Regions:
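N-terminal, positively charged/glycine-rich alpha-helical extensions of SAM-dependent methyltransferases
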Residues: 1-20
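C-terminal alpha-helical "lid/dimerization" subdomain adjacent to the S-adenosyl-L-methionine
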Residues: 8, 149-200
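Class I SAM-dependent methyltransferase SAM/SAH-binding core
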Residues: 51-105
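A short acidic, Gly/Pro-enriched loop at the edge of an enzyme's catalytic core
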Residues: 104-115
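A short SAM/SAH-binding and catalytic strip from SAM-dependent methyltransferases
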Residues: 114-127
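A short glycine-rich, Lys/Arg-flanked "PGG" loop and its adjoining helix->strand segment in the class I
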Residues: 128-139
Length: 225
């Protein structure tokens, strides 16, 4: 289980990076973020209400809104500067609303057909996050988590380590991203989020499946009621 210190990294990593996030996540994943978001969307077959946790600048939130134009989509994030960008970039959507809140602590009156979270799991306590998601899920609802994983294949892991080292070097030249690009590789290497969340989802009565993406550089975990 990750400690509270992992969650405390969020403001250190992201408070000053909202306006540049979209570009950095594209180049920082070698363009794979768009592919990963597409794979997340493929896990969503239908629904009238969606909750996107750690929505950031609203990249995934807007993609869900585009796929389900008649649905209600709520995005939650703990960082105000990111929500400011999300709201600005989502002006053309009338079915999206954003809330400043903590993914582990939010309480809403609504329940949702699907709850998504990309790049969030490694920062949270699995027991707390899953319990809160289940409490906001409809009877036939589905949870979809996505995050980085540390590749198991030695050859792929070698390339991944090289790329993470490159990101650390890049971070030294971008002041606002220095903490994130230096700290994230360490967090990714030590995180066992996929195993932890799989166990907790199963204990909460969810049907669990997972899918590795890009040779194990990230993964999608689903839990369905």
């Amino acid at each position: 289980m990750l400690t509270e210190s992992a969650k405390n990294l969020v403001p250190k990593f992201f408070d000053e990076t909202g306006t540049t996030y979209d570009g950095v996540v594209t180049y920082g994943t070698l363009g794979k973020d768009k592919y990963w978001k597409k794979k997340i969307l493929q896990q969503i077959s239908n629904g009238n209400s969606f909750l996107d946790l750690a929505c950031g600048t609203g990249i995934l939130t807007r993609k869900i809104a585009e796929k389900f134009p008649n649905a209600k989509i709520v995005g939650i994030d703990i960082t105000k500067s990111y929500l400011d960008v999300a709201k600005k970039n989502s002006n053309s959507f009338d079915n999206i609303s954003f809330i400043l809140d903590d993914a582990e602590e939010f309480k809403l009156d609504s329940k949702f057909d699907c709850i998504t979270a990309s790049y969030l799991p490694k920062y949270c306590d699995p027991e707390i996050l899953v319990k809160n998601c289940v409490a906001h899920l409809k009877p036939d609802g589905k949870i979809i988590f996505h995050d980085f994983t540390y590749p198991k294949n030695p050859s792929v892991r070698g390339l991944w380590n090289f790329f993470l080292t490159f990101l650390r070097l890049v971070g030294c030249f971008i002041p606002s991203w220095k903490d994130a690009l230096i700290g994230l590789p360490k967090l990714i290497r030590r995180s066992k989020w996929l195993d932890s969340y799989s166990d907790v989802m199963g204990k909460n009565g969810l049907k669990v499946n997972h899918q590795y993406l890009t040779y194990g550089a990230s993964a999608i975990l689903t839990g369905a009621k």
